[in-house]
Curated annotation (Swiss-Prot):
It is found in: Cytoplasm. Pathway: Amino-acid degradation; L-arginine degradation via ADI pathway; carbamoyl phosphate from L-arginine: step 2/2. Keywords: Arginine metabolism, Cytoplasm, Transferase. This is Ornithine carbamoyltransferase. GO terms for molecular function: amino acid binding; ornithine carbamoyltransferase activity. It holds the Pfam family OTCace_N. The gene is arcB. Carbamoyl phosphate binds at S57, T58, R59, T60, Q84, R108, H135, P136, T137, Q138, C272, L273, R317. One of its GO terms (biological process) is arginine biosynthetic process via ornithine. The lineage of its organism: Bacteria, Bacillati, Bacillota, Bacilli, Lactobacillales.
Length: 337
């Protein structure tokens, strides 16, 4: 009998149906419960997992590592200086080699095409830990966190504030509308999402009964908001744009004034982290000295407020990544969803 997930890669939200995405979220909640109760779930006993990182990471690396170990697998970290992807060796050749040695591959880097080539040529499941276009494992964690707080997803409204063109905004739009969540992008016109991404999300919204709003008007954006979400103003690889982004995005900061506009005491705040909410880092101090900004995408007040759920969200990276790896590699009996 055909298994729904076995042997499949997890590269972008658009590759999955609503039912499949919901299944992975609910499976993650189940695995989280098993973890909390100390019940072993070694679905990947004896498996070897390659963790390829072109981009640095705290949460993605920690989540994949602990998830693999909890599932009984052995994770092997290969950083930017350990692999030859596209430099001394083609991605195709690297994929074919790694596919002979590992049972599954995680990739976190710049190019979506690269993770797709790894999946095409390795012969094993490949999981996208982040590319410049999509961040699908983050979405499972995000929407699990939302569901934990509201008991549902359909009909809720999520507002993303900031750079509407980045991978997180892309993924929130597509995954949210796929799941029946209304997604608002609150961003300057210069950073509105790409038209093809918006059209894709609108197609999902039509099917799920959700809606999409892209606006630079704060009152319009937060009307009916259940979730406020933000991300860093400058993505990895765009560090030369700091001054421009600080000036452009300051009006889109998540602060208490914006929270109050939403007029929802049950509102939650999410951030995929790291967050620049104070000057308690070398990075934060440097930005404050150069640009006179001590709080960037979110104020410290909101970050530490009763609305904040970002550390729950970060923990959920592990549980949702575990669900993806187990479902695609664990030979689990999932004939339909």
């Amino acid at each position: 009998m055909t298994q729904v997930f076995q042997g499949r890669s997890f590269l972008a939200e658009k590759d999955f149906t609503r039912e499949e995405f919901e299944y992975l979220i609910d499976f993650a909640a189940h695995l989280k419960d098993l973890k909390k109760r100390g019940i072993p779930h070694h679905y990947l006993e004896g498996k070897n997992i390659a963790l390829l990182f072109e981009k640095t990471s705290t949460r993605t690396r920690a989540a994949f590592t602990t998830a693999a170990i909890d599932l009984g697998a052995h994770p092997e970290y290969l950083g930017a200086n350990d692999i030859q992807l596209g430099k001394k060796e083609s991605t195709e050749d690297t994929a074919k080699v790694l596919g002979r040695m590992f049972d599954g591959i995680e990739f976190r880097g710049f190019s979506q095409r690269m993770v797709e080539e790894l999946a095409e040529f390795s012969g094993v499941p490949v999981w996208n830990g982040l590319t410049d276009e999509w961040h699908p494992t983050q979405m499972l964690a995000d929407y699990l966190t939302v569901k934990e707080n509201f008991g549902k997803l359909e009909g809720l409204t999520l507002v993303y504030c900031g750079d509407g063109r980045n991978n997180v905004a892309n993924s929130l739009l597509v995954a949210g509308t796929l799941l029946g969540v209304n997604v608002h992008i609150f961003s300057p016109k210069e950073l509105f999402p790409a038209e093809d991404i918006v059209k894709l999300a609108e197609g999902y919204a039509k099917a799920s009964g959700a809606h999409v709003l892209v606006t630079d008007n704060a009152d319009e954006a937060v009307k009916g908001a259940d979730v406020l979400y933000t991300d860093v103003w400058v993505s990895m690889g765009e560090e030369d744009k700091f001054e421009e982004r600080v000036k452009l995005l300051k009006p889109y900061q998540v602060n208490m004034e914006l929270v109050k506009k939403a007029a929802n005491d049950n509102l939650i705040f999410l951030h995929c982290l790291p967050a620049f909410h104070d000057t308690n880092t070398v990075y934060g101090k440097d930005v404050a000295e150069k640009f006179g900004v001590e709080e960037m995408e979110v104020t410290d007040e909101v970050f530490r407020s009763k609305y904040a759920r970002h550390f729950d969200q970060a923990e959920n990276r592990m549980h949702t990544i575990k669900a993806v790896m187990a479902a695609t590699l664990g030979n689990l009996f999932i004939p339909k969803v």
